[in-house]
């Protein structure tokens, strides 16, 4: 929505799925199907602002059925940081836990409470035992979010790294769609 506003793409509209789907990627496809069925009658072109998001290719199968495109990549982290940069990050430390601006802001609700760590602290060691580093991929320069991300890393017992990515390849992908 921010990129649409910044670029004056007034002919584009956005619909959002519930953010809690980050914790249950197996439910994303069903939610997309419902939204696509409703949108087909209203819009001549539809573009999905998701990467694969942990669905194991199921989003792609659904989108083939509806003849709809999506953002390239396996994760939003990949299109925010850029494909090559994301590959380098993973090569440097495969045990990286990524946060975006949205996930920093929603961490307590989506992760801490959503994964029940607040009531079962023993889950922290189970969920995060293979992670070594928290990488915050910032879309906007925001010192408060950087501080919050650093505090989250400390809370999780992880090293902290900040990388300003802006909107990365997301802007290019949307631009290509918006100008077609």
Question: Whereabouts are the PLM-identified features?
Answer:
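Gly/Ser/Thr-rich loops at beta-strand to alpha-helix junctions
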Residues: 1, 21-22, 49-59, 77-79, ...
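N-terminal basic/disordered segments at the start of proteins
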Residues: 1-8
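Structural alpha-beta junctions
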Residues: 8-12, 41-42, 65-71, 151-164
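A short beta-strand-loop structural module common to alpha/beta enzyme folds
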Residues: 10-29, 162-166
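Short, well-structured alpha-helical segments in soluble
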Residues: 31-42
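Long, charge-dense
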Residues: 58-110
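A conserved mid-domain beta-alpha-beta active-site/ligand-binding segment of alpha/beta enzyme cores
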Residues: 90-145, 150
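C-terminal, charge/polar-rich interaction regions
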Residues: 138-180
